[in-house]
């Protein structure tokens, strides 16, 4: 594979063309140094075979932002420890150098003085206006901070500096955000002056280090719109790329511009952007420069990464490496089909970062927990029965088998997948099935036995030592008058294609299942009304998918009733109590069919006579059904305890 060939970048060589791009992780210590969680995360990527690893958002001064920081000699050792670990595993390490879009000193002073309200107001103001208010003298001071950071990185043994071409640097370059009238505003030459000055000074101060530049490109959206603000449109990016090469940049990292407040622009979720949506842009840049070009953006599989050849020299895999840090090693060993591929849900990664939690992946229980979650051989090999072949049962089987247990999965239906078989049916959700295909590939290799169409019964007890129960949940029904009428069905039965509805359909419940079912039915010609007790629908949906979802509902003329409680169902309508401005009115909504999507209840088999140790995982464990993240983690942990 071309993907696995070495490549010369500046004065160093990457062992392959697989890059872990800069991502905010939330793992760093309070002072921004590399602590144990951060160290183990990046070390795991290096052990997995990644050729080039970049630490995202490294600030060159003390800020209150939850990002890595490198501004003091006391922090060098933590970065050196990581650089050494990367080198021991054949990887090169880079840091992404950036400056926040705000006046760091002013905000730090406000926070230290306890002026929280003023600080929040200042931050909000600066995020909109700092690019135009920061003085030329302050910009020069910022470059000095960045030079100091680069010197410290060099002392730590870091190989590369990636200039973050978004954030402050990208705002200055941007024709959309930059409204300055001095030497840093106006035409392209002025807007890129700071970036080029920074690059030249970095080349002077750390001549032995590779200089990478993240080149964010503003892309078209519809007829007159655009995605991203903190970057350049393609025509200007092409000119700027050649100027960056002339200034001494060793490699360019082509990416979608950000700075819109919607992380779905640079990190699009399932079905919201084509696969490899930035590859055509990297191809144009590559045609203009002689230095290596990397590209990032919805490149999911080894085959897709290999297909980038000719359009970019290096492939950046962010979410894909969170899902499977052994991506490179599996490719090198000829086991591409065993790569666990990202389903682009953005739940554990992008949403977590936006919610000020740390980076993780819902499909990889070890991600972010590399120190505490490791698969080790079992003390005693046992015969394990797993009841249920949903994603929790499948993950438990994988982990238990890797630990040396003999695993048999009982599944009463004739196919594996559980709830993901229906969760993948609504528009844009088919990518979820990749997670099931992964288990179809790896479990037979681990000698896991499947008993499809069979239930676990008393006659099986003597054949096993312990049992993992992963029987999931079932669709709940609201106990209102009329709930047993033939026009009433469940969202799960609709998505499983067990029931067909038409005409006017009322979907009871505006959670994620209800809203996705509504979109699914509207796309098939139904006139749909969503009835939700709360004041908002789809609260569980990723913020990177929600705008697309709401736009599709509006386009399909789906009616939405919030703060509305179902009280009765009759043969031709649902009766709803709608509360607005503390006043409640009764509405009758014509309905040919009523679809219940009001949550789930645990599905617990009767195992009272089973003498074996029982371990409950996934939706059938805990107080109430949960989500994929809980299913995977509970399965992993249970399998590691046996």
Where are these regions (language model features)?
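Flavin-dependent oxidoreductase catalytic cores
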Residues: 1-387, 391, 395-407, 415, ...
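Active-site acidic short loop of glycosyltransferases
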Residues: 208, 290-291, 464, 502, ...
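Rossmann-like dinucleotide-binding cores of NAD(P)H-dependent redox enzymes
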Residues: 409-449, 520-566, 622-624
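Short gly/ser/thr-rich secondary-structure transition/capping motifs
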Residues: 1-7, 36, 366-370, 447-454, ...
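Short loop/edge segments at beta-strand edges and connector loops
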Residues: 297, 436, 452-455, 490-492, ...
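Generic hydrophobic alpha-helical scaffold/packing signal
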Residues: 241, 245, 282-286, 309, ...
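Rossmann-like dinucleotide/flavin-binding elements
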Residues: 381-409, 451-459, 463, 470-480, ...
């Amino acid at each position: 594979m071309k993907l696995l060939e070495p490549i010369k970048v500046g004065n160093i060589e990457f062992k392959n063309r697989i890059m872990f791009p800069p991502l905010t992780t939330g793992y760093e210590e309070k002072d921004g140094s590399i602590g144990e969680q951060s160290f183990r995360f990046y070390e795991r990527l290096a052990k997995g075979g990644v050729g080039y690893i970049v630490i995202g958002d490294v600030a060159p001064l003390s800020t209150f932002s939850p990002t890595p920081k490198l501004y003091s000699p006391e922090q060098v050792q933590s970065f050196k420890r990581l650089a050494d670990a990367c080198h021991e595993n054949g990887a090169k390490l880079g840091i992404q150098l950036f400056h926040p879009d705000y006046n760091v000193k002013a905000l730090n002073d406000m926070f230290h003085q306890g002026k929280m309200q003023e600080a929040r107001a200042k931050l909000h103001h600066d995020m909109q206006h700092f690019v135009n208010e920061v003085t030329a003298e302050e910009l020069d001071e910022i470059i000095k901070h960045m030079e100091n950071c680069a010197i410290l990185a060099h002392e730590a043994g870091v190989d590369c500096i990636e200039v973050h071409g978004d954030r402050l640097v990208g705002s200055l370059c941007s024709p959309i955000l930059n409204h300055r009238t001095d030497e840093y505003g106006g035409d392209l030459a002025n807007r890129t002056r700071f970036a080029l000055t920074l690059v030249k000074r970095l080349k002077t101060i750390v001549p032995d280090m590779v200089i990478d530049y993240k080149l964010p490109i503003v892309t078209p959206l519809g007829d007159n719109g655009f995605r991203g603000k903190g970057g350049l449109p393609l025509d200007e990016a092409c000119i700027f790329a050649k100027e960056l090469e002339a200034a001494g940049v060793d490699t360019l990292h082509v990416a979608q511009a950000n700075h819109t407040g919607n992380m779905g622009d640079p990190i699009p979720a399932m079905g919201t952007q084509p696969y490899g949506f930035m590859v055509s842009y990297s191809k144009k840049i590559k045609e203009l420069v002689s230095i290596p070009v990397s590209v990032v953006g919805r490149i999911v599989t080894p085959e897709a990464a290999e297909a980038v050849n000719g359009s970019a020299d290096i492939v950046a895999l962010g979410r894909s490496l969170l899902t499977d840090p052994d991506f490179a090693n599996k490719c090198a060993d000829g086991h591409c089909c065993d790569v666990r591929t990202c389903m682009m849900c953005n739940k554990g990664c992008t949403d977590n970062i936006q919610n000020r939690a740390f980076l993780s992946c819902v499909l990889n229980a070890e991600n972010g927990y590399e120190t505490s979650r490791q698969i080790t051989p079992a003390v005693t090999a046992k015969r394990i029965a797993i009841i249920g072949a949903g994603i929790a049962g499948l993950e438990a089987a994988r982990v238990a088998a890797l630990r040396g247990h003999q695993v048999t999965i009982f599944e009463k239906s004739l196919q594996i997948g559980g709830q993901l078989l229906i969760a993948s049916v609504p528009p844009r959700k088919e990518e979820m099935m990749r997670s099931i295909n992964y288990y179809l590939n790896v479990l037979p290799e681990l000698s896991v036995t499947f008993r499809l169409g069979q239930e676990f019964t008393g006659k099986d007890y003597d054949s096993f030592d312990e049992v993992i129960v992963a029987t999931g949940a079932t669709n709940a029904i609201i106990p209102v008058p009329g709930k047993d009428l033939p026009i009433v069905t469940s969202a799960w039965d609709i998505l499983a294609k067990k029931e067909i509805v038409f005409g006017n359909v009322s979907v009871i419940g505006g959670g994620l299942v209800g809203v996705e079912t509504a979109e699914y039915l509207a796309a098939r010609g139904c006139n749909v009304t969503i009835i939700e007790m709360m004041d908002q629908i789809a609260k569980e949906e990723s913020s990177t998918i929600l705008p697309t979802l709401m736009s599709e509902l509006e386009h399909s003329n789906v009616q939405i009733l919030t703060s509305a409680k179902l009280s009765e169902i009759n043969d031709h309508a649902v009766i709803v109590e709608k509360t607005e401005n503390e006043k409640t009115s009764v509405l009758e909504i014509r309905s040919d069919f009523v679809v219940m999507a009001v949550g789930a209840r645990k599905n617990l088999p009767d195992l009272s006579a089973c003498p074996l140790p029982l371990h409950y995982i996934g939706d059938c464990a805990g107080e109430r059904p949960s989500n994929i993240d809980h299913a995977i983690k509970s399965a992993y942990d249970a399998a590691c305890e046996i």
